[in-house]
Amino acid sequence: ATEKEEKERQGASGALRALLCLTPVVLASVMHGLLRDGIITWAPSYLQESFRFPAATSIALTMIVPPVNLAGVYAFNWLRNRLRWHETGTAAMAFAVCGAGIVLWATLGRGSVAITLMMLILSTTCMAGASTMLLSLLPLRFYRMGLLATVIGLLNASAYVGSALSSVGFGALSEQWGWTSVLVAWCAVSAAGAALCAMARGVRRAFP
């Protein structure tokens, strides 16, 4: 009985350490939710106010985004397999490319519908790739510890927190300081997401 209790304590301790290692990934999942749903939710309003499109046209233009985003799932999964990267490293790259796209959007796309749509597609495609890495593939590494469902639930809940914050936060930001401030905020969130994924060394060491 004593040996069994010791094994149970060791298992609980290992599970706790594993979950603590996930702290940067949990925060990165919040950033992912902020960006993914923030961009998708507010893109029609951005197009309507920036280019004077009717609401129906703005919504129709953003409807092309989800099908194209599937390319991000395959592209970043291919990159991970090709370069033998960890999921957190691949997600960091997705955040970085997303941030670069938003910088181009902010600097070159304010007067161009074509550039705006291209950068909109690029940024959301990157977030589709990050979603696959953080919310689908990374939790599989915790299967042997019996934490698969826990990690999936934790990371998805974190993404939903970001999604909820984006619904209110970016709308208030655009009303107060305009769309430039929203684009700057998206750049900052992208940088934070990339940094948090890069900081997730504990996960990479424990689950290479």
Give the location of each predicted region.
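C-terminal transmembrane helical hairpin of 12-TM major facilitator-type secondary transporters
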Residues: 86-137
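Multi-pass alpha-helical transporter architecture, strongest
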Residues: 105-107, 179, 184-208
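Helix-to-loop junctions at the C-terminal end of transmembrane segments
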Residues: 72-86, 174-175
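Small/hydrophobic positions within alpha-helical transmembrane segments
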Residues: 31, 64, 68, 122, ...
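Juxtamembrane helix-start elements in MFS-like secondary transporters
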Residues: 54-62, 116, 148, 152
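Juxtamembrane intracellular "pre-TM" segments in multi-pass secondary transporters
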Residues: 1-25
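A late C-terminal transmembrane helix in Major Facilitator Superfamily
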Residues: 142-177
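Extracytoplasmic gate region of multi-pass secondary transporters
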Residues: 18-77, 131, 135, 166
